[in-house]
């Protein structure tokens, strides 16, 4: 008498063994049309399966939150099946699901093209129209091995040999006569896999080992219905339009080249943005009483060994030799700041010391992970290190939080998420010290009326931390700011101060970053604004365009007037149609376009329009300059409306 328990908490008792179809008819017959899978004791089962003992059953229809991944697992192996249909000699290595989609890695004699993606997608659609059932079979290790050996699928044989014990069963899924290793629960029938799109081709080493063969990876996305697929494709199109790499190239902000991977060649316009952002942070540093320092790019490897960075990060550290001495190209600023702190004796009266640097850091990131300004090998950290007593920690944390929000408020991100990472299993320091430190951080967040999420066990081994995550208008999260307590580094590098009892005491270090990396933050801003940066950050703030040659003298006069008050301005005297000029400078994301013709020249006024197409009409020059200067000085995120 099997007792069947259901996901909703109900149960049903049967007097004899019963098929899944019969259970469905008794429990929920209406679900049959939308049922994509059934899980019995957390394992996929066919509809004709008979249940002979107690079981836990879950019906998965298209509305179930698990449906999406089940469809994506199915599409991943549908893609493998399509590949084998078109290119029988191609070797399927692995397939799996990822966020928003799926992929398949293949070993093929030639490079796969965009045209091939269309061919494969059409083949997948043809297979879906057959509405075949997907079968799951458990077979022996030797049977599974033999199946893939006969098909010359060496990668599948390798996966079986390495991951499955010779006495174990192997779970295979069958798409018609095509067998593949079970990677996850799949749909009953391929008809539920209609809504997919193949997207791009990439490269990946077998088992992520650069000593192995490079495979070709085909990426796709899949959804439960057409509306969700279309919505996702629209989202991807919007991402492509906002891609900082494309916008950066079009606006001539920077470039990167093969001879210096992960390093940025800043052009004049991009460097203006960089410096404006850096100067803005400098204003805040002064306001919050930081001292700016500069530490060497090269520091003896011995320091990095003493600090512990060499043991933990040596694979990411560039090194160089000089006169039989090995140096590290700094991957971070903190050990250098400790050297400045240690350079002279400190009293408790000197603390807190807030030390900031725009440090040029280098990290040997894998070439495959490099991505425009977002992931580079050379970047500028806007971090700071606060050396303070234990009693000063709460006050300093509070000021750090205020400074971070003060600066972020200028950029009007959709939301700021806050996470508090607590003690990991492996850590230094006593439980009482961790209790006190975690309470310091949480109390300061609460005092500032900030909601936050705990990340249990995610803190560094040397102290808890707060992360500030910026959410953009496309709901993407960017982790930028951090406040990190550190009890470890000052101990490792022998830092101390003299307290009021004339005793040596080890200071606490607070690591504080706001933008994180200036380069990455510029990339985030470009994508958030689609290149339409606020006026104060725009490389060119105003362009004056002439209608005819008659007004060229007045254009030059205006150019000087704006330049004299440090407004970044260009003039366009080309003999082109006015509509052409306006469109060109709008595409260049220049905030304000001033139009000068005979009417403007004779009245000594200007016609103004912004890059959104709003026409202000003809206005007084000095009035406009005054309004523009106010917009720039206040670092207004939005343009003037009148």
From Swiss-Prot:
Disulfide bonds: none annotated. It catalyses: tRNA(Thr) + L-threonine + ATP = L-threonyl-tRNA(Thr) + AMP + diphosphate + H(+). It is an enzyme of class 6 (ligase). Its cofactor is Zn(2+). GO terms for molecular function: ATP binding; metal ion binding; threonine-tRNA ligase activity; tRNA binding. It is found in: Cytoplasm. Zn(2+) binds at residues 334, 385, 511. The keyword Lipid metabolism does not apply. SUPFAM superfamilies: Class II aaRS ABD-related, Class II aaRS and biotin synthetases, ThrRS/AlaRS common domain. CDD domains: TGS_ThrRS (cd01667), ThrRS_anticodon (cd00860), ThrRS_core (cd00771). It holds the Pfam family HGTP_anticodon. GO terms for biological process: threonyl-tRNA aminoacylation. Its EC number is 6.1.1.3. Binds 1 zinc ion per subunit. Residues 243-534 are annotated as: Catalytic. NCBIfam families: thrS (TIGR00418). Belongs to the class-II aminoacyl-tRNA synthetase family. This is Threonine--tRNA ligase. The gene is thrS.
């Amino acid at each position: 008498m099997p007792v069947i328990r259901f996901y909703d908490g109900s149960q049903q008792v049967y007097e004899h063994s019963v098929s899944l179809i019969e259970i469905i008819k008794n429990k929920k017959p209406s679900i049959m049309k939308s049922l994509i899978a059934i899980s019995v004791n957390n394992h996929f089962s066919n509809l004709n399966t008979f249940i002979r003992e107690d079981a836990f059953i879950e019906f998965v229809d298209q509305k179930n939150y698990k449906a999406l991944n089940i469809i994506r697992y199915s599409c991943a192996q549908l893609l493998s099946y399509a590949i084998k249909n078109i290119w029988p000699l191609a070797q399927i290595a692995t397939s799996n699901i990822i966020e928003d989609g799926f992929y398949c890695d293949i070993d093929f004699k030639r490079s796969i093209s965009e045209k091939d993606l269309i061919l494969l997608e059409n083949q997948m659609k043809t297979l879906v129209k057959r509405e075949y059932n997907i079968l799951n079979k458990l077979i022996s290790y030797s049977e599974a091995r033999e199946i893939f050996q006969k098909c010359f699928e060496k990668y599948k044989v390798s996966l079986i040999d390495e991951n499955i014990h010779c006495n174990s069963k192997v779970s295979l899924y069958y798409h018609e006569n095509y067998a593949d290793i079970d990677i996850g629960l799949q749909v009953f029938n391929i008809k539920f896999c209609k809504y997919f799109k193949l997207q791009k081709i990439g490269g990946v080493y077998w088992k992520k080992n650069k000593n192995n063969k490079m495979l070709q990876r085909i990426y796709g996305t899949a959804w439960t219905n057409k509306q969700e697929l279309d919505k996702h494709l629209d989202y991807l199109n919007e991402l492509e339009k906002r891609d900082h790499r494309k916008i950066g190239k079009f606006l001539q902000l920077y470039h990167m080249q093969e001879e210096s991977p992960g390093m940025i060649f800043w052009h004049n316009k991009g460097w203006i943005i960089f410096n404006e952002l850096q100067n803005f942070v400098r204003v805040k540093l002064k306001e919050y009483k930081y001292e700016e320092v500069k530490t060497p790019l090269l520091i003896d490897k011995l320091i990095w060994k003493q600090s512990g960075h060499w043991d933990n990060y040596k694979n990411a550290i560039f090194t160089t030799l000089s006169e039989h001495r090995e140096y590290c190209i700094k991957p971070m600023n903190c050990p250098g700041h400790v050297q400045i702190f240690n350079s002279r004796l400190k009293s408790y009266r000197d603390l807190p010391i807030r030390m900031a640097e725009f440090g040029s850091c280098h990290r040997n990131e894998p070439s495959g992970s490099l991505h425009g300004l977002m992931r580079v090998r050379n970047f500028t950290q806007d971090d700071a290190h606060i050396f303070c007593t234990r009693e000063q920690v709460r006050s300093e944390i509070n000021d750090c939080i205020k400074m971070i929000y003060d600066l972020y408020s200028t950029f009007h991100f959709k939301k700021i998420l806050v996470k508090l990472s607590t003690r990991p299993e492996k850590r230094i320091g006593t439980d009482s010290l961790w209790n006190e430190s975690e309470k310091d951080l949480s109390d300061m967040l609460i005092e500032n009326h900030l909601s936050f999420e705990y990340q249990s066990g995610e803190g560094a081994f040397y102290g808890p931390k707060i992360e500030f995550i910026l959410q953009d208008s496309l709901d993407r999260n960017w982790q930028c700011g951090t406040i990190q307590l550190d009890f470890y580094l000052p101990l490792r590098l022998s830092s101390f101060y003299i307290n009021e009892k004339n005793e040596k005491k080890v200071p606490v270090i607070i690591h504080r970053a706001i933008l994180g990396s200036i380069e990455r933050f510029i990339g985030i801003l470009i994508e958030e604004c689609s290149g339409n940066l606020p006026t104060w950050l725009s490389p060119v703030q105003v362009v004056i365009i002439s209608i005819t040659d008659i007004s060229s003298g007045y254009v030059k006069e205006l150019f000087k007037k704006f330049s004299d008050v440090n407004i970044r301005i260009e003039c366009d005297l080309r003999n082109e149609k006015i509509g052409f000029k306006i469109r060109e400078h709008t595409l260049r994301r220049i905030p304000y376009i001033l139009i000068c013709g005979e009417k403007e020249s004779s009245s000594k006024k200007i016609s103004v329009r912004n890059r959104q197409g709003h026409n202000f009409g003809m206005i007084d020059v000095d009035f406009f300059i005054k309004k523009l200067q106010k917009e720039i000085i206040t670092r207004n995120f939005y343009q003037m409306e009148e």
